[in-house]
């Protein structure tokens, strides 16, 4: 399902900086644009038949993931500021995609853990430890919240950053990705039950 959206986001995140489409419906240059679009999502999903509780759960998860794009890149965007945000639901299968062309998980977490080895270790740490690059703030639980809800609700999550990919469902598998992602790319899939 939604292979067109997945192809579109991979193109958006890997295209040369001067060729990135920042005029499209899926581009959110600022947090307020992202939040306004995300706030509309639950009602749109419910109108298409998604269970209310699942609609609001994936809304909360998308909010966490999308806000991370802005929180961890503020003042540090290497090229294109903002995030790609898209969602779709066909009455049975749903997808939410969030991507940013920011510093990525490894470079973000190295602010708190300078000796972090590679993208694989960074993803492992991000999903399992209470850690944040914003070391003076009490943060670092967002991806644990996402991971817990993916597992509890039989959702599927793919998270790409650098040369690493985390696949989450009831278990988490971290591997080297065929696709290099400068920044982060998240694909969340869900089904109405």
Which residues fall in each region the model found?
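Bergerat-fold GHKL ATPase/HATPase_c domain
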Residues: 1-63, 67, 71-85
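Conserved beta-strand-loop-beta-strand hairpin that lines the nucleotide-binding pocket
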Residues: 7, 70-193
């Amino acid at each position: 399902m939604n292979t067109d959206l997945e192809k579109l986001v991979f193109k958006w995140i890997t295209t040369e900086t001067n060729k990135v489409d920042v005029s499209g419906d899926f581009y959110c240059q600022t947090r307020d644009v992202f939040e306004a679009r995300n706030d509309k999502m639950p009602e749109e999903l419910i109108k298409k038949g998604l269970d209310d509780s699942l609609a609001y759960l994936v809304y909360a998860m998308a909010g966490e993931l999308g806000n991370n794009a802005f929180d961890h890149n503020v003042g540090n965007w290497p090229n294109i500021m903002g995030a790609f945000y898209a969602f779709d639901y066909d009455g049975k299968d749903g997808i939410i995609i969030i991507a940013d062309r920011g510093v990525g998980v490894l470079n973000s977490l190295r602010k708190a853990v300078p000796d972090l080895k590679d993208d694989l270790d960074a993803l492992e740490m991000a999903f399992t430890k209470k850690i944040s690059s914003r070391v003076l703030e009490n943060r670092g639980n967002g991806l644990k919240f996402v991971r817990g809800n993916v597992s509890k609700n039989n959702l599927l999550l793919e998270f790409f950053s650098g040369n690493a990919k985390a696949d989450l469902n009831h278990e988490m598998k971290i591997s080297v990705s065929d696709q290099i992602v400068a920044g982060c790319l998240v694909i969340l899939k869900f089904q109405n039950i």
